[in-house]
Each structure stands twice: as structure tokens, then as C-alpha cells.
Amino acid sequence: AVLPPAPADEADAVEVLRGPNIQPFPQSRPFADTLTAELVLKVGDNITTDHIMPAGAKILPYRSNIPKLSEFCFTVCDPTFPARAKAAGDGIIVGGSNYGQGSSREHAALVPMYLGIRCVVAKSFARIHAANLINAGILPLTFENPADYDALQPGARLRIDDIRTGMAAGKLTLTDTAAGKSYPVVCSLTERQQAILLAGGLLNYTKEHAL
């Protein structure tokens, strides 16, 4: 038998019982027109989703527990990353070529989002991972000049202005506020992807556009 949905007032009163390793799904925040964030991690070429979100028997039991999974994020590259990312509030990751290659696991985007990552700037992205970042509310940008990768160092305070206008134009500017230097970055997004990011991810976008 097909059961019709409960009326809204009854549905709101339904209590969802979760096991100890099932936590509520995290949601990103909508983008303001300016993002100021710390460069919390710089990685090289061919970073895989296994680097970002390791797999294996130790981690598998927590697949529905994003807060617990966050303790393992990028730890194969930098064991201090989870704590530093949470402390930074808003964070940016800089990567080399083919960032996010390998398994298409969504956790490699959802977990960094939970840790406060708002943007990844790379020389290039693996296509599926770039789409997952967008759905998680993380802005994927590519260097217009790949050599600019060398100039950015962890700990820098970075700013991106006029995000809405820049998304539509396909170009934004990344500014190192302490060094006073700016770097052009490319923003290759469809109109729908722009709307998803501005809403703070696919879940927020879907809620806004639900009938």
C-alpha cells in the first residue's frame, strides 16, 4: 500500500530516531558577495578523493557520521588539517592539476564543507569532483595563470569580491590581503550551478525551489 504524506503539522512532530553513528546531514551557508577566508591547506597535483577522505575498515562505520569522518579529512597529507580548518571558520584549499581524481565519493566534498571549506582553487579539477563540490556549496575555481599557484602559501588571508557578478562573468579575482597581490581565477559554471552555489549547495537550492 502507498501511504500519503502526513499533514504538515503532524509531520513536524515526527521524531527521527538515529543510531549512534548516524548524524544529521550538514548544510552549507549561502554565499555572501564577498568571501574572506584563510588558506588552510596547499596540496600538489593528482590529489585523489582518497587523499581528501580516506576509506577503509577504520572509517567505514562512520559513513553516515560526517562530524566523525571530518577527523580523518586530509590527514594523509596533513594530520593537523581537521583541527586547523575548524578553527579557521571559513577556509580555502589550493591544489595543483587534476584535483579530486579517483573515486567519485560525495564524502570528499561533504566533509570539507562541514569543516568550513568554502572554496578550492586549483590548476584543474577532475570533472565529477568539481560537480560534487558545487553540490556541497564549495566554489571550485581554476587559476587563469597556473604559475600563480606557487605564490600562494598556507596561512594567507584571501579575499574574493563581487562573487555574484564574477560567477556570471566567468572570472573572479583572488586577493592575498597581506601581500597586496591579486590573482585572476576562472569560474566555469552553468546558470544552475551558480544558483546552487549562491544558495549554499544543492540541498538548500532544492528546498528553495520545492513546489
Predicted regions and their residues:
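Fe-S-dependent hydro-lyases/dehydratases of central metabolism
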Residues: 1-211
